[in-house]
Swiss-Prot record:
It holds the Pfam family FAD_binding_2. Keywords: FAD, Flavoprotein, Oxidoreductase. GO terms for molecular function: steroid dehydrogenase activity, acting on the CH-CH group of donors. This is 4-oxocyclohexanecarboxylate 2-dehydrogenase. Its cofactor is FAD. Its EC number is 1.17.3.5. Optimum pH is 7.2. Optimum pH is 7.6. It comes from Sinomonas cyclohexanicum. SUPFAM superfamilies: FAD/NAD(P)-binding domain, Succinate dehydrogenase/fumarate reductase flavoprotein, catalytic domain.
Amino acid sequence: MEYLVGTPRSTYDVVVLGSGAGALTAAATAARAGKSVVVLEKASLLGGTSAISGGMLWIAANHHAREAGFEDTADAALEYVRAVSRGRAREELLAAAVTRGDSMLRFLEHELGVTFIYLDNFPDYRQDLPGAVDGGRTIEPELANIADLLGDLADRVRSDGRAPFTMQEYEDWGAFTRFPWDELDARAKAGLVAKGRALVAMLLAAAIREGAHVAVEARGERLIYSGQGADDGGRVTGVVLASGERIDATEAVVIATGGFEWDHSLADSMLASRLYTMCSPPTNEGDGLRMAQRIGAQTRGTREAWWAPMSITGDTRDGRPIGTLLRFERQGPGSIMVNRHGKRFANESQNYNDLARCLQSWDSPANTTLNTPAHVVFDQSYLERYGVLSHRAGEPTPDYLIEGATLPELAAKIGVPAENLVATVERFNAFAVTGEDPDFHRGQTAYDKYWGDADNVWPNPSLGPLEQGPFYALEVVNGAFGTNGGIATDGAARVLDVDGAPIAGLFAVGNATESAYAAGYPGAGATLGPLMTMGYLAGRTIAGQAAGYDDGAAAASAAELTDLAEPVLAEAAR
């Protein structure tokens, strides 16, 4: 174990396992209330999955939207997330995530100095469901100067190497082809970071300012637990590390160790579908889940993950192969996705979580996969306009791209019937000319259009023909950002035992826990939004403070949010 901040101690009020956004929110919130806190990170780098994420938060009825004149209500948001979760989410967690999110946001801004940008037109992912809105619920961190915030610690925060720009700037610039790359290079040299790394940097700086200690290479192995169960006064009083070191917690241990996607035996035994790749840190091996299970914690939702279509391109993290998320590669006008039969099988522009589920389909009569192997297919003109991942036209074709001079040649190389691929492209090209996709309705929703090209010469920003050879294919596999089921908690982030009673002294947040939205993915930031809210609620509960936060500003929906939350949360407390 290496202390990066503070000197080693054997006892703290609060021990936080993990250093992602949920962990740091819990740590900073508790430290702000005067608690002594230590953050213990398993890896040598801080930030976990959060640091390499998009950094966005899905917060319904947030004050930024209200101040901009955007009309949103907790009622509408709850109706929406109930539909997105397909009836599988627990009402207590839904209420906590939806009605306490803005309290978390205002607390971070006013008490901890974390700053955010409001995205006015980033649509909810499922525009077809009741309660969805076409903007206002997603926010993102502002650009942050990580060197100014953290000094020498800046290099200890994970990075995915992305250029420092916000999604608001992406909207303003319109497409990657118009990015001011020289300006972005200058920003990076000046220490500016964006997205998840900016969020983690601001949260980490806040926790340190409030007195939290931080250590790395500190893998938790076992909880110190007195008693046989919640009904006999059992309590978690600390943690034993893999190194054998013991750290006592006088008030609480917070598990925020990430998911279990990198433990292949756990993933294969729990997830509903085979996970072929992921892009999270390899340290996400279910440590916190096992620790909690050993003392009788309840688990829920472990069949699910934050699914996403990915490709294997040779990217690595901590020396391990990872998947690369496919976004514009499948959403831009002039590309399609075909299955093992050479046919389109879904709206390629839909959100990544739902599209990945289409990769999981099984053909029972044939006893084989229905749609995989699957490939994104595009032509030379697409490559010249947009590039694909980091590859640009004129460069040698990378190994992960399959090239064919003609569609039949490409079909032979990817193992699909040539006549099907040719017919599929011809049919899609006709749709591109008219601007309508009667097969899968691509380009109809605000979400589809958001990720299209507003300058597309064809009628629909999401549709364009594939006409100019050579043609290219990129294999698509079922991937995930991480798992999103695990330790069950109540609406205050207290871990529940198998009988549904809170385990004293134990809290959990983040991907180590059951998702508030169950199998659903409401919109951009639906991972970080609720997990940071639960981190805030954990910190407030440990400190004996109210869940709500009043910064003295007028909040039109504050009473409404309280009215909605209190009955559900009060019932859970009983």
